[in-house]
Amino acid sequence: MKFLGIDYGQRRTGIAVTDAGGRMAFPRRTIAMTTRDAFFVELLGMVEVECPDAFVVGLPRLPGGEETLTTRQVRNFVERLKRRTTLPVYFMPEELSSFEAEDDLRDAGLRGRRLEAVVDQQAAVRILESFLAVPEERRSLA
């Protein structure tokens, strides 16, 4: 299966995809949030190009598992996404994926605008990699 990973944010959303076999994840794009409609046009346009079998959306929580305002925003986004597509949507619990992605990119020598341009994509890659490591029977649909 091919998955499209999403690191949703109020200002920017990182997108990554897996290969057709669902073994490796690759960064694809960062979508800037201008309007909700424009955002979904761009996201669903990527779906047409990438042809994923399902979405994987990072679900941020505090280290103790508590939900936050951001968690609720992601859940609301997923509900809007599900109204626009028939593809299944999986949640992948995440803690600090953006911070870890930023560390990875800094270690690779990226700074400033170059880092900011791809950090959300790298976070989406981390979300997908975590998801792919979970046995299928333990994956949770949104």
Curated annotation (Swiss-Prot):
Keywords: Cytoplasm, Hydrolase, Nuclease, Ribosome biogenesis. GO terms for biological process: rRNA 5'-end processing. InterPro entries: RNaseH-like_sf, YqgF, YqgF/RNaseH-like_dom, YqgF/RNaseH-like_dom_sf. The keyword Protein biosynthesis does not apply. It is found in: Cytoplasm. CDD domains: YqgF. Gene3D superfamilies: YqgF/RNase H-like domain (3.30.420.140). It is an enzyme of class 3 (hydrolase). Its EC number is 3.1.-.-. PANTHER family: POLYNUCLEOTIDYL TRANSFERASE, RIBONUCLEASE H-LIKE SUPERFAMILY PROTEIN. Belongs to the YqgF nuclease family. Could be a nuclease involved in processing of the 5'-end of pre-16S rRNA. This is Putative pre-16S rRNA nuclease. It comes from Nitratidesulfovibrio vulgaris (strain ATCC 29579 / DSM 644 / CCUG 34227 / NCIMB 8303 / VKM B-1760 / Hildenborough) (Desulfovibrio vulgaris).
